[in-house]
Design a protein with these regions (language model features):
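Non-catalytic substrate-recognition and accessory regions of acyl/acetyltransferase enzymes
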Residues: 1-186, 204-212, 226-306
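Conserved acetyl-CoA-binding loop-helix of GNAT-fold acetyltransferases
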Residues: 186-202, 213
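Short catalytic/ligand-binding loop motif for oxyanion handling, primarily in non-cytosolic enzymes
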Residues: 220-224
Length: 306
């Protein structure tokens, strides 16, 4: 297998990868081409995972860890190389399934999000969440507008009845969605556009025309209302949902999403250079906790039903 290909070079440029990342990834890809044993071992991992269909991803990522040690490459970087080498295979599978090429490029944009997160948190080009891509490569998770969506089920052991009287029960079909760290503001227009696009893709699963979007995220932490600015897009995003449950913990596990590499600092040393960081730093310094929530949106294709 040729590793540094025109497809992968164009892939990195299409998403405007940082120069340092392109330089690092190009070096490693060319090394795989030049060092046959190294390249063959990587090929075995990529092909073992992708054929006949993606499965047991962690098994192959464990192999990447061993390669990183054997060939003295950063684990996060080599994980990303593994993902890059999967992308042209995924591209062909989109074509085979008749999935629009635009959807492929929109969906694969997530790799840049994770790349930037890794640079900000680990100070190295790569990814520290390579396993996240199993859903993408199995053609189960797709980007439609600002968000990423996939088929899910309501998996709580209690029923939930919305304000409009819709009941969710264990095992009921829902559409889960995720919020990539693309930096695109969560405005009313952007959110509604994503819901409408996803509705068109999944409406065949909901014969009565009513779709249930489900999300679990730190963004749905209900106490945001106590300390985020009134006009915050996070609060607007939260207002789309009916909250099913929420929790908070002494150890704010999602702090890295806000503070990047500084998330492990004492609270009195957390940076305050953005409005979100400032609000969170002040909240945590006052002895409060961070948390997350799970919620549902009832959608009829045009509007949220409340």
């Amino acid at each position: 297998m040729l590793h540094y290909t025109e497809f992968i070079a164009d892939f990195m440029n299409r998403y405007d990868y940082p120069a340092e990342a392109i330089e690092t990834f190009t070096r490693v890809l060319k090394r795989l081409d030049e060092e046959k044993e190294f390249g063959d071992k990587m090929d075995k991992l990529v092909e073992g995972y992708m054929y006949p269909w993606p499965d047991n991803m962690q098994e192959y990522l464990n192999g990447v860890i061993e390669l990183s040690k054997e060939y003295d490459e950063n684990e996060c970087t080599l994980d990303f190389i593994f993902l890059l080498l999967c992308t042209p295979i995924v591209y062909e599978r989109y074509k085979e399934r008749g999935i629009p090429e635009e959807t492929y490029w929109d969906t694969m944009a997530d790799l840049r999000c994770k790349l930037i997160e890794c640079i900000k948190c680990e100070e190295v080009p790569g990814t520290f969440v390579a396993g996240w891509y199993n859903g993408f490569f199995k053609l189960e998770r797709f980007a439609y507008g600002r968000f990423q969506f996939e088929e899910c089920t309501y998996d709580f052991n209690f029923d939930f009845v919305t304000k409009a009287g819709y009941r969710l029960t264990a095992g009921q079909k829902t559409i889960g969605f995720h919020i990539p760290s693309s930096g695109v503001p969560l405005t009313d227009e952007v959110r509604l556009d994503a819901y409408k696009k996803a509705y068109q893709q999944y409406k065949h699963l909901f014969p009565d025309g009513i779709m249930y979007f489900w999300c679990g995220s730190w963004l749905l932490y209900p106490r945001h209302k106590e300390f985020l600015p009134e006009k915050s897009n996070i609060l607007k995003f939260m207002s789309d949902f009916e909250l099913i449950c929420w929790s908070e913990a002494e150890n704010f596990h999602d702090a890295w999403r806000i503070f990047d590499k500084y998330s492990d600092l004492p609270v009195d040393q957390l940076p305050t250079d953005t409005s979100l960081r400032k609000a969170y730093a002040e909240w945590l310094r006052a002895g409060n906790k961070g948390g997350s929530g799970c919620g549902v949106i009832v959608f009829d294709g045009e509007k949220i039903i409340r």
